[in-house]
Swiss-Prot record:
The record marks 149 as: May be catalytically important. The gene is folE2. The keyword Hydrolase applies. GO terms for molecular function: GTP cyclohydrolase I activity. It catalyses: GTP + H2O = 7,8-dihydroneopterin 3'-triphosphate + formate + H(+). Belongs to the GTP cyclohydrolase IV family. PANTHER family: GTP CYCLOHYDROLASE MPTA (PTHR36445:SF1). GO terms for biological process: tetrahydrofolate biosynthetic process. InterPro entries: GTP_cyclohydrolase_FolE2 (IPR022838), GTP_cyclohydrolase_FolE2/MptA (IPR003801). This is GTP cyclohydrolase FolE2. It holds the Pfam family GCHY-1.
């Protein structure tokens, strides 16, 4: 059998010399080591194609470079090395390299009061690039929380006041009777509406970080809002959650401002943008607010 050289179509010159901003692959399944364990990630990998006369890039070289994340932890340095490999394998063709990783980060969260605990999953995206010789990394997280409408709470309190006035008008106030009334559905005739809400935060990381501060960012977001959704609970935890919601009444504007102030205190953040979405239980539409700093 005659030995033939395999054709390399990508190396051929193209008659239409048009540079391309991004060429690569999306949706690559990849195990990565993060926070002491292996997680299933999806990767988008690409480079620019400045040499417009070149037919294409060498996608297999990008794919093989990603194997580094199977052997070492996912850190800014590891990501930078992969992007450098992308460029080295496309010398003369590309001046910019890009990598996006998405995965779910699991954290075991304690209940508010009881000794119970359970796992929560947070959607994480890491966007990195080398452009004009500069390395940039952005970290995005999606954090669910509960929000209770301040207006609805005020209206509910007014209805309770009216019911109290109707039930006790012209009577001598008896402490035990009032306590019983307060604990009954006849007394508490209205409750404010609340909903599961979502905070989406994107942070541009500083240049000298040795780790990706995923858990720290999630903790700061949940602490600033005060109403993180729960996992395993007993009745005491559910009561504590009701108290937390009552003490943290929030319009979407309030939530966005809380997050903005909290994120500005992170010295490792060069810039950020955020978006909060309250999936209204009163309306068929969502209430949304957004903010950004140095973005």
């Amino acid at each position: 059998m005659t030995s033939l050289t395999l054709p390399d179509i990508a190396a051929q010159k193209h008659q239409h010399a048009t540079p391309l901003a991004w060429v690569g692959m999306c949706g690559i399944a990849l195990p990565v080591h993060f926070d002491g364990r292996s997680v299933a990630a999806m990767a988008d990998a690409g480079v620019s194609l400045e040499d417009g006369s070149s037919r294409g890039i060498h996608m297999s070289r990008l794919y093989l470079s990603l194997e580094r994340l199977e052997r070492q932890s996912l850190t800014p340095l590891a990501i930078r090395q992969i992007l450098a490999d992308f460029l080295a394998s496309h010398e003369g063709l590309s001046h910019a390299a890009y990598l996006r990783l998405t995965f779910d980060h699991l954290l075991k969260r304690p209940a508010l009061v009881s000794p119970l605990a359970g796992w929560k999953s947070y959607s994480i995206t890491v966007d990195a690039k080398i452009e004009n010789g500069m390395f940039h990394v952005e970290l995005s997280v999606r954090v669910p929380y509960s929000s209770t409408c301040p207006c609805s709470a005020a209206l509910a309190r007014q209805l309770i006041q009216q019911q109290f006035q109707a039930d006790f008008s012209g009577q001598a106030i008896n402490r035990e009777a009032v306590l019983e009334w307060l604990g009954s559905s006849h007394g508490i005739v209205a409750t404010p509406h609340s909903q599961r809400s979502l905070a989406e935060v994107n942070v541009r990381l500083g240049d000298r970080l040795e780790v990706l501060p995923v858990t720290e960012l999630i903790d700061r977001i949940e602490a600033s809002l005060g109403t993180a959704v729960q996992t395993a609970v007993k009745r005491a935890d559910e009561q504590a959650f009701a108290l937390a919601n009552g003490q943290n009444l929030m319009f979407c504007e309030d939530a966005a401002r809380r997050l903005h102030q909290a994120l500005q205190q992170m010295d490792w953040a060069k810039a950020f943008k955020l978006r909060v979405e309250h999936a209204e239980s009163l309306h068929a539409h969502d209430a949304v607010a957004a903010s950004q700093w140095q973005w």
